[in-house]
């Protein structure tokens, strides 16, 4: 139905002029009737856009429990009023300053994706009104964050962040459901500690790195010392064995001289220069 058509007809009649004579009263009445009819039709219809739902408030019976989907619907003018709700999920960021188990202050930013329970729209309007999310979400998010964060130390908020997020999500969904608000997603987007705590953590990390470096140097020195001891023990044992061999077997010295002479001769044979050596140079004079 074209809502502008009755007003267009009225405008055309005004341009042509009202009938004169005995038909003047009839023409005026028809014009008024058409205008009233068009106005009544226009005020008796309301539209519900996509992603929205509507309920009615009646001056006689109050809020009705019927929920109107998308499309055009009728209402009684001056008696009924349509109340529109956006039922699409809406994001909202809420910050909360709270304390940890070890009394460290931390600023947490929580992002929630919320929407109203369509079947509970009349109850939501009766108890909370149209700005239900503004009335409920900031308070319950702060309450849940404070209760969950107080169970963990500051360091655990970093190492166990997934567990913290899960507890916040579960508790927040339960609290929001009491107000007929559905949460499609809850996430901790930002966790910021105090400057003093951040500086203390950095100092602790530097100290741990220095301690690990010192431990490495100590271990390396200990290993080098152990290597020297083993080498000295080996050399001492070798000297002891050589002394015993010389004492018990006099020919051991001649054997070592022959081995030394062979090594010298082998080295000189590979040289480009020709060198004449006598037996004394090769330590062979004393060999019996």
Swiss-Prot record:
Stretches that traverse the bilayer: 21-43
GO biological process: mitochondrion organization; mitophagy
Keyword presence, Protease: no
Gene Ontology cellular component annotations, sorted alphabetically: mitochondrial inner membrane; mitochondrion
Localization per Swiss-Prot or TrEMBL: Mitochondrion inner membrane
Locus of motif AIM: 125-128
CDD domains xrefs: SPFH_prohibitin
Location, primary (coarse class): mitochondrion
Keywords from the named record: Membrane, Mitochondrion, Mitochondrion inner membrane, Signal-anchor, Transmembrane, Transmembrane helix
Record InterPro entries: Band_7, Band_7/SPFH_dom_sf, Prohibitin
Domain of life per record: Eukaryota
UniProt KW Cell inner membrane keyword: no
Membrane-topology annotation of the record: Single-pass type II membrane protein
GO molecular function: mitochondrion autophagosome adaptor activity
Function, in words: Prohibitin probably acts as a holdase/unfoldase for the stabilization of newly synthesized mitochondrial proteins. Involved in mitophagy; may act as an adapter for atg8 that supports mitophagosome assembly. Negatively regulates the proteolytic processing of atg32 via the i-AAA protease. Acts as a negative regulator of the m-AAA protease.
Membership in a protein family: Belongs to the prohibitin family.
Self-association and partners: The mitochondrial prohibitin complex consists of two subunits (phb1 and phb2). The subunits assemble into a membrane-associated ring-shaped supercomplex of approximately 1 mDa.
PANTHER family: PROHIBITIN, PROHIBITIN-2
UniProt protein name: Prohibitin-2
Protein species of origin: Schizosaccharomyces pombe (strain 972 / ATCC 24843) (Fission yeast)
Gene designation: phb2
